């Protein structure tokens, strides 16, 4: 795993079970100042990362860890769409330490959450390969914040969630409503899975 600020290699694991994002307090401070500055070019580039069906909805919020926030820093709720905002407004806010999307309220977007889908080198484990091959037409796939999981966003009607325990401590969860997904915008490319799907 690498420091989000300088790219230096850092270990996995930390206090209270959190995976560290920065190699030092200096890098943490630099990242904080960059977030506060919030340049328009950074916001524009992140908006362009997400596909139109996601970027166009008003289901976005800021985040402090895994806790959703409004753009003004007050708590946001999965059941209160008035606390959500368009993506460009969320990216222009400096509240918290990140951002994410709320699922539901007719947005037509769902998410497969694959926990522990990547090994320590960022390589897909076997069960995750099988799950990914079986997901039709993903909208967007990203690496999760702890860099050991994936978020696979798809178009979907709202329906009950599901959870499966997978080998090696993995989990495959599916949500389409009443759920906050903290996003990273770090694309995980699935080009190589096209041939695998066609061979089945």
Each language-model region and where it sits:
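Conserved phosphate/metal-binding and DNA-contacting active-site motifs used
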Residues: 20, 34-200
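BZIP DNA-binding basic region
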Residues: 1-39
């Amino acid at each position: 795993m690498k420091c989000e600020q300088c790219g230096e290699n850092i270990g996995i694991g930390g206090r209270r079970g959190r995976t560290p994002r920065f190699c030092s307090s200096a890098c943490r401070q630099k990242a904080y100042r960059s977030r506060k500055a919030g340049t328009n070019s950074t916001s524009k580039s992140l908006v362009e990362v997400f596909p139109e069906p996601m970027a166009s909805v008003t289901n976005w919020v800021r985040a402090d860890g895994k806790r959703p926030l409004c753009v003004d820093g007050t708590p946001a709720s999965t059941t209160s769409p008035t606390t959500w905002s368009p993506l460009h407004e969320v990216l222009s806010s400096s509240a918290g330490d990140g951002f994410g999307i709320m699922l539901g309220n007719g947005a037509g977007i769902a998410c497969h959450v694959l926990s522990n889908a990547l090994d320590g080198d960022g390589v897909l484990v076997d069960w995750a390969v099988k799950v990914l091959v079986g997901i039709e037409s993903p909208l967007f796939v990203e690496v999760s914040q702890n860099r050991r999981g994936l978020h696979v966003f798809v178009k979907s009607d709202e329906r009950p969630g599901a959870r499966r325990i997978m080998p090696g401590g993995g989990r495959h969860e599916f949500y389409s409503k009443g759920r906050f997904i903290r996003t990273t915008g770090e694309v995980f490319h699935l080009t190589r899975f096209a041939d695998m799907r066609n061979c089945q």
